[in-house]
Amino acid sequence: MPLSPFFLHGSPSEQRLVQDLVNEHLTLFGQDILYLPRKIVNRNTVIREITASKFDDSFRLEAYLGNVDGFGTPSDVLTKFGVRAQDEVTLVVSKERYDDFISPFMKLFPAEERLNAQTPNEGDLIYLPLDNALFEIKYIERKVPFY
């Protein structure tokens, strides 16, 4: 069945509508989180490994809990190296909100203290007040959305 000729698919006004609906959904059904960006204190110049970092800023942001694995279940595993917590959380954050409220402050950091100001980075921290838990960002979905 062909697309309806009464809608302009991909027009800027419809893209704006979809973005506004995403922001409203996050505001209504999301949770407040604290985003703690990592500042690099010391970097090994040979293999470019970050050897020391600090977290001295925090930004309040709304996020939607897309998938929660490990909450409410005994997911701590005793290994030969100690206790390993396997709690995971998948958060959905609006790119527009991040660009409006966090990116301008991240651009004020010196270039040697940050990795990227446009998106969150692996190694940054998320504080979830719902569970009083601190999570490290392990993966960022950097693909451009369809709209």
Give the ranges of each region predicted by the language model.
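Short, conserved turn/kink motifs that form compact alpha/beta structural patches or helix kinks used as
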Residues: 43-122, 127-133, 138-147
